[in-house]
Amino acid sequence: MNLLRITIGLACSYFVFAILLNSVGTVILQAINSFDITKTQASVLEGYKDLSIAVFSFAVASFIPRVGYKFAMLVALGAVTLICLVVPSIAQFYVFKLLFAVIGCSFAIMKISVYSVIGQVTNDANKHSALLNTIEGIFMVGVLSGYWVFSSFIGSGNNSGASWLNVYYLLAGLVGIAFISVLFSPIQSPQKETLPSSQWRAFLDMLALAYKPLVLIFIISAFLYVLIEQGVGTWLPTFNNQVLKLPVDVSIQLASIFAGALAIGRLVAGQLLRFIGWYSLLIGCLIAMAGLVLLVLPLTHNIDGSQVKSVFDVPFAAYMLPLIGFFMAPLYPLLNSVMLSALAAHQQAAMTGLIVVFSALGGTTGSILTGFIFDRFSGQHAFYLTLVPICLLLASVTLFKKMTLDVSVKQVKQ
């Protein structure tokens, strides 16, 4: 019963953060329409979210166990509830910068706490993996739900007014429900004797880990992956609206296919890995991603979907582009798994901190770079740009494979 109550608290929290974190693409589109700003200006919202996650993860990772996971989660949820209530009453672009900064800082707290609590309440690897996959599965449900929640408040026109901001009252209510579920969850604080003797030492160990060649090439690979994912995911609603000329609500709903493709891709990859090696799967996925970009983007020229009324009427090319998420899906979890497995157990917490930080930096870079190219050239040019990090990933993943083999050989000899 206690495990169920804890799982509900963690799942509710991850669900609402999935909606908020992945709303940045929708908010960018609406900010362009509602506040008459450029795509380059709007793209900074991704930076406010991801850089907040990166900086705050560095700042609080070793401090959270000392104040308690439950207290930390309640603070994060309380802060997000308050900012969601503030947004509709101000209705200015700068408040969205504050919104995503608060969301980013709060998610840094939440992710560290949730992963730590899962380790507390499970006593073997299989149970840990099962609970973690359940929570991450709920996260993907939240991502999918978010597109439809926002589109229902926006309507079928371009809606340059501010009435769509009322969605944040609903979101504040959902975050409030998560707050209550965590409040009544029997989440325990870690034992004092298990905490590191020095927060500064833990921080220095994390920095020292980044100097290892294997870790460095992994960081580059993770950075490139998130650059692609956030560049595509964040700007897909705007691409649908301004390149394919689809209505705003349909543009946002159609972007949910990308999230669905990511979820399905990870489930399928889990089964395929029973039969093929991780390296072969990743190389195949990268080649398929590049092929899909080269095949689909030429089909998006001269499309006028302004008369489309629902997602069932959109042009074929509009369905195809989000499917890049299916091939993209296995990359990130597989890279993380291989990297963590190559390290000693006592180094994995520090490695997790580095993953969070450089993933956030990659997301910011991808969104800003895509927005800049989109603004100066076109949406097609911006999405063709993904071919560059895809090619770089082919090289970095190959090098990563070779280095993990070298590490395995050394461990066997020792």
Regions found by a protein language model. Give the residues of each.
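Conserved MFS/SLC helix-loop-helix module at the cytosolic interface between two early adjacent transmembrane helices
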Residues: V55-Y94
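Cytoplasmic helix-loop-helix junction between adjacent transmembrane helices
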Residues: L99-G137
